[in-house]
Regions:
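Asp-based, Mg2+/Mn2+-dependent phosphohydrolase catalytic module
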Residues: 1-38, 130-131, 137, 146-270
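A generic alpha-helix signature
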Residues: 53-54, 101, 143, 175, ...
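Hydrophobic residues in well-ordered beta-strands that form the structural core
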Residues: 50, 141-143, 217
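N-terminal helical cap/lid subdomain that shapes the substrate entry/recognition surface
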Residues: 33-135, 148-151, 159
């Protein structure tokens, strides 16, 4: 009886003289993988997804329910801030609830909007996320939102993008303190200085810079001035694995002293 595999022996033998590619991943086949960042750390609200309008609506409804007034300028003050700090501001505007209750109400309302209106992805974010995942670059979601909301958004991505999620209810210090970014890098088993962090707000950028990461700042609701401390991009649209790797390598060459030894004081925005 002729073995089923006998017809393949000549084909197998023909491979012995062919060079064997070390990189079997088609996404990174033409890329110097030694120049890839150790991980990419994503902010969520305003960077990955355009949820800031949902938060603003939730804040407005909550303040008005207690007879107060909440303006657009008021809402802009909270962009990128931790939820407990935001709750204190809402209390000062007349919301007669404990801080934890305010956070719970806001998060629930935003999640309701996500469920009814869908996930508004920021331009280019999902495409870059998908390409990084295909290239097997470790990724973390680093957000000041609660874990339940981060899990909701992560679950809708459509693939297992994030190795870990560090949320605001997991850390002691909110952005602009670097704790969340340092925690994410630690969980991934990498040094923050070998990571790329993608952010959109001043507190978030300050936190990422203070962690020692190479920072891509993509402003959304609040403008960010050019700075030697980060790479500013108008949008993630058109940014791919090659672009990100080149930006990372260029930044590492121009700032070889990037380190995770910066202090929390350095993270505080001017």
């Amino acid at each position: 009886v002729k073995p089923l595999y006998s017809g393949r022996l000549d084909w197998v033998a023909s491979l012995k003289d062919r060079p064997c590619p070390l990189n079997l991943n088609p996404v990174t086949a033409n890329l110097d993988t030694s120049s890839l960042p150790a991980a990419v750390l994503w902010d969520m609200d305003g960077t990955l997804v355009d949820t800031e309008p949902y938060w603003m609506r939730a804040e407005h409804e909550l303040v008005e329910s207690f007879g107060g007034v909440w303006t657009h300028d008021d809402a802009m003050l909270l962009v990128g801030s931790g939820l407990l700090g935001s709750a204190a501001i809402l209390q000062n505007r007349g919301v007669d609830l404990a801080a934890d209750a305010i956070v719970d109400r806001l998060t629930t309302r935003v999640q309701e909007q996500l469920a009814s209106a869908g996930i508004p992805w920021r331009p280019g974010a999902l495409e870059l996320l998908r390409e990084l995942h295909a290239a097997r670059v470790p990724m973390a979601l680093v957000t000041m939102s609660e874990q339940r909301m981060a899990q909701q958004i992560s679950g809708i991505v459509g693939f297992d993008a994030f190795s870990t999620i560090v949320s605001g209810d997991m850390v002691q210090q909110s952005k602009p303190h670097p704790e969340s970014y340092l925690t994410a890098a630690d969980v991934l088993g990498v040094d923050a200085s070998q990571c790329v962090a993608i952010e959109d707000s001043l507190p978030g950028v300050a936190a990422a810079v203070a962690s020692g990461a190479v920072v891509l700042a993509v402003p959304h609701m609040v403008p960010l001035e050019p700075s030697e401390h980060y790479v500013r991009l108008d949008t993630l649209a058109g940014v791919n694995l090659t672009t990100l790797t080149e930006l990372y390598a260029s930044r590492r060459r121009s700032s070889p002293s990037l380190t995770t030894t910066q202090t929390a004081k350095d993270a505080t925005p001017a």
